[in-house]
Structures are given as structure tokens and as C-alpha cells.
């Protein structure tokens, strides 16, 4: 949303100061809303934890005195979760960094239009996060993550098809909307899936792997484009998205087997 607001102020008023002020006011408003609604978040978290315990979804792996001895990477389901984090951040960065180059070089769209469309891709992520923030009160994170992944794959599929240029914009927006619930959903599910006592250490690993994806996958796209052509951009994005879906579903399968074994 920030790039869209800033570009609008620069285009209409030839000044960045108004855009800077508008973004600052939005950020302060969000902070105020979060502070006011903190009690609500705590009540929702407590009720959700109670519901998961009653449904047998909450699993504790160790007693408190054994926490330091646990190898979190050895817990079943952790490794495919880390792969999903790596691919998520890699895809988000790759689309943001190379999407405009694909639009200009392959779709023959002007640089100004391409930049605006990529801003709308980020706008899709922002809008998706706002929407899922409310939906998550009623819908399980696992469902949101899965739906988001299917939406991203649909968006990448649109980029692959020989459709009019306007459909490329739809594809980028769908990818942004689909990506929105995945990252926060995976983070939020960590204590439930792998135990509260393991979550702090495991989230640290998840952050490290996520930044690794942001660091290395976009340059990989650049190397591939240099050696071949930017026409491969949607194919590579689709490959990453499908691999992320398979990794996330692998975790669900492992958790399902564990729940059945517990019963």
C-alpha cells in the first residue's frame, strides 16, 4: 500500500511529503487499533487454545525440565515446514523484484504501467492480510493456508496462459492475495503443531530459513533469466508455489498420522 500511496502523491502533487505523512498516519492508526484491541486478541487466543485441546489438536512434546534436550529439527513435520517458509519468502521476493521485468520484457508493457501493477501485487498482499485478519476468527489457519496456496497457483497459471495483458494484472493480484494468509498462518500454527516449549527456538529457525529464501531465490531467477529468457518467470514461480503446497500438505499428513496414533 505504501508504494501506491507514495506514487499517487508524487504523480498528482509532484511531492513526496504528502505521501510520507499519509503513510505515517496510517501506521500510527494501526498501532492505536492494535493497542485498543489487545484484550480481544488475548480472549480469542485463549478460546482457540481451549478448543484445540478439546479436539486433540494440541500436542505437548516434553516436560518443562526436558526442553533444553529437544532437537526441534528432529520433530516430525518441522523440515517440510521450513521448506515451505523458504519457498514462501522466495516467491514473494521473486515476484516483487522480477515481475516488472517480466511485464516489460515479455508482455511489452510500459515500465510505468508495470511498476503500477507490481504495486497492486503488494496491495493484494496488504488487502489479503486485512481480510484474513478478520476471517481467522472464524476459519482455521490450516484452511486459510491451503486456500491461499491454491489462489497463488491460480494466479501463476493465469500468467502462463496467452491471455490479454489485463489478465497479467489479475494474475499478480491473485498471487498477492493468495500469499497473504500463508506466512502469518504458518507462524501462528507453530506452537499448536510443535508445542509451545519448542516454538521460540523453532520460530527462530523459520525466520532464518525465510530470509534465506528471500536472499537466494530472486538471484536464482536472475541467473536463469540471464542464461535463458524472462519468459521462464511464470514457470519458475509456479514451480516454487507447487513445491510450497506439497511441503505444507506434507506437514498436514504428518500431523494427521500423529493425531490418529494418539487416538
Spans of model-derived segments:
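A late C-terminal transmembrane helix in Major Facilitator Superfamily
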Residues: 193-230
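Paired small-residue
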Residues: 155, 166-174
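Juxtamembrane intracellular "pre-TM" segments in multi-pass secondary transporters
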Residues: 45-81
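Intracellular juxtamembrane helix-capping segments at the cytosolic ends
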Residues: 181-194
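Helix-loop-helix hairpin linking two adjacent transmembrane segments in secondary transporters
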Residues: 1-43
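Interfacial helix-cap and linker-helix signal at transmembrane-aqueous boundaries
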Residues: 4-14, 103-104, 135-136, 221-229
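Extracytoplasmic gate region of multi-pass secondary transporters
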Residues: 74-119, 123-126
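Structural signature of the two symmetry-related core transmembrane helices
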Residues: 143-158
